[in-house]
Structure formats: structure tokens, C-alpha cells
UniProtKB/Swiss-Prot annotation:
Induction: Down-regulated by dark treatment. It catalyses: [protein]-peptidylproline (omega=180) = [protein]-peptidylproline (omega=0). It comes from the Eukaryota. This is Peptidyl-prolyl cis-trans isomerase CYP21-4.
Length: 236
């Protein structure tokens, strides 16, 4: 048997252990697979990124819409509809006619928040007619009040001019002259001068107690009576 030379064995060993070559087609296929995977990842990222941005924008628009509606609703629907008028004789609770006299009610609410009525005196009390509070002399002369009072029994009584209605004279030029009047009898003939914007719900007895005070010849109370504060309420 022929012996293999050491050099031949070494050469055979090198041939067996040598790495096998990778074909060009295999390399191309691997590169294509990697490219497809990367492209898929990029596409997926862009899709979810755009979806996330759209969601955020939608939520932002929705929040702005809700905020706008909330602000609008506060002015339209959530305005106080009642007020507690605290006087030196007791508490008078009134309902405000927000729909019937919106501009006057808005003005009244604004003045309440500024404490305009705090300390306001009842400057005129006409028995079986009305009580009036204000910081300045009334724009309607006493003679006109009393003359109209004599005629009230002959005129048609409207629902807004019954007893215990809350009103203010028309044609008041500024806030400091804003007066409060509460009728103690039907006054159907003052549509041309009186704006009715509320009615007494509780405290008619307090109004009547104010009505019974002693007055001078100008219908001014001999003893000071006034409003100590007004508290606005959404409900009674």
C-alpha cells in the first residue's frame, strides 16, 4: 500500500477546512430581504406617526370646541336666574326675567358683582304702590307717581305689572343711577317709564314691612332703610 506523503496530507486537510464561497445571487437575495424589511418598518412608522398627529389635532379641535361652547353656554344658559336682596328689614328673594328683559338683567348682574347695591337706601316709599331704592334722586317726580296711582284702578292690568314685581325706570343714562323698584300693588300704566325684569318669590312680608314705615311729605322714610347686599343664585 502506497504511503501518502506528509505534504499531500497537509494539502488535503487545507482543502477540506477551507470556507465555502457564497454565491452572488444569495447576496442579492439577502440584500433585497433587508431592504424590504427596512421599507416596511419605515412605512409602518410613518403611518402610526401620522395617525398619532391626526388624533392629537382632532382632540385639540374638540377641546377648543367644547371650551367655546362652555364659554358661550355660561353666558346664555348659566347666568344666575335668582337673587337674594338683603335689606335692613329682612331678605327678599327675586326671580330674574333673563329672557324677557335680557339687557336689563345683564346690567343688574354686572352691578351686583360690583357691589353697586350694597348700602343703597330706600329713598321713596309710597304705600299701596311701590318701594324704591337708589343712590340718586328719582327721575320720575312724586306727582307723576301719585297721579298714575289714582288711575291704576281704571286701566287693564298686565301680568308684568302686578304686585311684587321688580323693575327699574327707563332712560337711565349710567350705572350709578340704576334704581330698584318693587311694586306693592298692580301698576298697569307704567309701561312707558318702567322696565320690569323680575318678581318677588319670597319676602313679600319684608316688602310690606318696608312699605309700612313712616315717611315725610316727599315719601322719604324718616328712618334709614337700605339694602345691605345682593347674592346671585343659579337656583332657589
Amino acid at each position: 500500500m502506497a504511503k501518502i506523503k506528509p505534504q499531500a496530507l497537509l494539502n488535503q486537510s487545507k482543502k477540506k477546512k477551507g470556507p465555502s464561497r457564497i454565491s452572488i445571487s444569495t447576496i442579492i437575495v439577502c440584500n433585497l430581504v433587508v431592504a424590504v424589511v427596512i421599507l416596511s418598518l419605515v412605512t409602518t412608522y410613518r403611518h402610526w406617526s401620522q395617525r398619532s398627529r391626526n388624533t392629537i389635532e382632532h382632540e385639540t379641535r374638540s377641546q377648543r370646541f367644547e371650551d367655546t361652547n362652555t364659554a358661550s353656554g355660561q353666558k346664555t344658559y348659566d347666568l344666575p336666574g335668582f337673587a337674594d336682596i338683603n335689606t335692613s328689614k329682612g331678605l327678599i328673594t327675586v326671580e330674574l326675567f333673563k329672557e324677557g328683559s335680557p339687557e336689563v338683567v345683564d346690567k343688574f348682574l354686572d352691578l351686583c358683582q360690583k357691589d353697586h347695591f350694597k348700602g343703597m337706601p330706600f329713598q321713596r316709599v309710597i304705600k299701596n304702590y311701590l318701594v324704591q331704592a337708589g343712590h340718586s334722586p328719582s327721575s320720575i317726580p312724586v306727582e307723576e307717581w301719585t297721579a298714575k296711582g289714582k288711575l291704576r284702578g281704571r286701566l287693564h292690568i298686565g301680568p308684568k305689572h302686578e304686585a311684587f314685581m321688580l323693575g327699574t325706570p327707563k332712560n337711565k343714562g349710567n350705572n350709578k343711577d340704576f334704581e330698584l323698584l318693587i311694586t306693592t300693588a298692580p301698576i298697569p300704566d307704567l309701561n312707558d317709564q318702567l322696565i320690569v325684569f323680575g318678581r318677588v318669590l319670597k319676602g313679600e312680608d319684608v316688602v310690606q314691612e318696608i312699605e309700612e314705615v313712616d315717611t315725610d311729605e316727599h315719601f322719604q322714610p324718616k328712618s334709614p332703610i337700605g339694602i345691605t347686599g345682593v347674592v346671585l343664585k343659579l337656583e332657589t
